[in-house]
């Protein structure tokens, strides 16, 4: 049966629950609104301001791209600014091509989202996968 045959009587895919900071996603939890910033991650104030607007609009998770190691390192500044302003919303690092950025981000934010299709070197992807297991943070792998 398709999950979209009758839009007034839908069923959700069965998933396991995962904690992202204080938020539980998957399982029988409600669907949480999330969005991704468009500001340059190296522009801390612009990313913080955009994140605050998203949170105030109802986002429960804020995704921030971290395409480089420097971007990943700057996630600490972004997170610190948000926490100083009283915002505790979990942050998600969106990683695409840089395995080292994922390793850095995993030590800073509540979740790391990785698309393995963007990793050309399978060996590098396996290396990052093992390092994230030791950190015990949620990691989303998509293909």
What is each PLM-predicted segment?
Residues 133-143:
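Single conserved hydrophobic/aromatic residue that forms the stacking wall/gate
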Residues 29-46, 91-97:
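Active-site mouth loops of central-metabolism enzymes
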Residues 28-31, 58-60, 85-91, 108-110:
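Short, well-ordered coil/turn segments that N-cap beta-strands
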Residues 1-34, 140:
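N-terminal amphipathic alpha-helix/helix-capping segment at the start of soluble metabolic enzymes
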Residues 47, 51-54, 78, 104-105:
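Generic structural signal for hydrophobic
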Residues 92-102, 109-129:
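Hydrophobic, well-structured modules enriched for small/aliphatic residues and gly/pro motifs
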Residues 38, 59-80, 116-125:
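Glycine-rich, proline-tolerant flexible connector loops at the mouths of alpha/beta enzymes
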Residues 66-108:
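N-terminal active-site wall of soluble small-molecule enzyme domains
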């Amino acid at each position: 049966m398709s999950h979209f045959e009758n839009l007034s009587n839908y069923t959700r895919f069965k998933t396991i629950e995962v904690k992202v900071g204080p938020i539980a996603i998957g399982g029988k939890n409600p669907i949480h609104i999330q969005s991704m910033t468009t500001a340059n991650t190296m522009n801390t104030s612009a990313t913080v301001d955009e994140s605050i607007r998203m949170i105030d609009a109802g986002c429960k998770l804020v995704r921030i791209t971290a395409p480089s190691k420097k971007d990943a390192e700057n996630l600490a500044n972004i997170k610190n600014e948000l926490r100083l302003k009283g915002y505790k919303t979990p942050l998600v690092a969106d990683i695409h091509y840089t395995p080292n950025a994922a390793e850095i981000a995993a030590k800073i934010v509540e979740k790391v989202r990785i698309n393995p299709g963007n990793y050309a070197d399978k060996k590098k992807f396996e290396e990052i996968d093992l390092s994230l297991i030791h950190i015990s943070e949620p990691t989303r792998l998509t293909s």
